[in-house]
A protein has these predicted regions:
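C-terminal alpha-helical interaction appendages
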Residues: 1-65
Length: 65
């Protein structure tokens, strides 16, 4: 998964790109080692791995996996 696809999915899941950005800066997730989405991506985690954590955290439907 590319970063552009990751952010498209975030926008789809959260309803707007601005909310997706804020959420990704503020929501700390244990599944990302106690980091935010932004921190995990900046540390080099793959967008696919980060998306999986977001998907599980938000309890999104399988169709958005």
């Amino acid at each position: 998964m590319r970063h552009t696809e990751f952010w498209e999915r975030m926008t789809e899941a959260l309803g707007s790109s601005s909310y997706a950005t804020v959420w990704s800066e503020q929501q700390v997730m244990a599944s990302l080692g106690g980091r935010t989405v932004q921190e995990a991506l900046a540390a080099g985690e793959s967008p696919k791995l980060v998306w999986r954590a977001v998907w599980e955290n938000l309890e999104l439907p399988m169709s958005l996996r």
